[in-house]
Every structure is written in C-alpha cells, then in structure tokens.
C-alpha cells in the first residue's frame, strides 16, 4: 500500500533537517582554529594561504569570504595593546574655545544679509519669456 502524502512529507522534513547545517557552524569551526590563524598571521602568511591549507587539511569547510569575515571580526578587530593608565595630571588640559554664534539684537533693526551676486552661466527658468523663444 503506498504511503500517504503527509507521511512522505514528514519523512522528507526529518531528512532535510538532519542535512541542514547550523548557521553558527562556521563561527564555531573558526574559533576552534583561531589560535593557529593568529600564529600563522604573526609569521607573515597571507590569509588566503592559511585558508587554502586549512581547507585542504579539512580543518575548515566554509568559503574564503566567511573565513575572512570571521578573521576580521575575531582577530583583526581586537583593540591594540592599551598602555597602562597613567596617573592623572594635576590640571586638566584646557578645552578649546569655540566661537559663540552671533545673535541678532533684541531691539532695533535686524541685520539683513548682503544680497548674493547673480550667478554666472546657465540658470533654469521654468516659465520662459516669449521674446527669448525662437
């Protein structure tokens, strides 16, 4: 007797779930070889060379773009060695002075800005003059 469609569908979903890779599988694999990658980079090897070797030896199974993004995120983005905090100076450095914006006076006439010079060259006029047309 043939299986019903729902039984076939249930088997297919289960087999597909078993084959489906985890999203973080590449990150976990990279973190497992992170120390090796750091040592190889410190020795002067290129990132693509390190990835090719690890791919051939089976240490990583993901693309170079993924490898590169994990290297950037987990190795190259680390902050540089921060020096030990020094004792605070007795006087803090003076803050740079910024000029205060000019405000118009409350009473009297408000200053009018100087009219801008007429632009030279082409200017678009949406309502053309009849005399300017051919």
Swiss-Prot record:
Pfam families: DUF5338. This is Protein TraK. Residues 99-112 have a biased composition (Basic and acidic residues). The gene is traK. InterPro entries: DUF5338. Residues 74-134 are annotated as: Disordered. Residues 83-92 have a biased composition (Low complexity). The keyword Coiled coil does not apply. Keywords: Plasmid. It comes from Escherichia coli.
């Amino acid at each position: 007797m043939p299986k019903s469609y729902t039984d076939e569908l249930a088997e297919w979903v289960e087999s597909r779930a078993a084959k489906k890779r985890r999203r973080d599988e590449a990150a976990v694999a990279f973190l497992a070889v992170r120390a090796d990658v750091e040592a190889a980079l410190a020795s002067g090897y290129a990132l693509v060379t390190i990835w090719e070797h690890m791919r051939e030896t089976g240490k990583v199974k993901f693309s170079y773009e993924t490898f590169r993004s994990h290297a950037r995120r987990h190795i190259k983005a680390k902050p540089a060695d921060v020096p030990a905090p020094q004792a605070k100076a007795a006087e803090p450095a003076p803050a740079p002075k910024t000029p205060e914006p000019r405000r118009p006076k409350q009473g009297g006439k408000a200053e009018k800005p100087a009219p801008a010079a007429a632009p030279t060259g082409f200017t678009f006029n949406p309502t053309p003059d009849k005399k300017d047309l051919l």
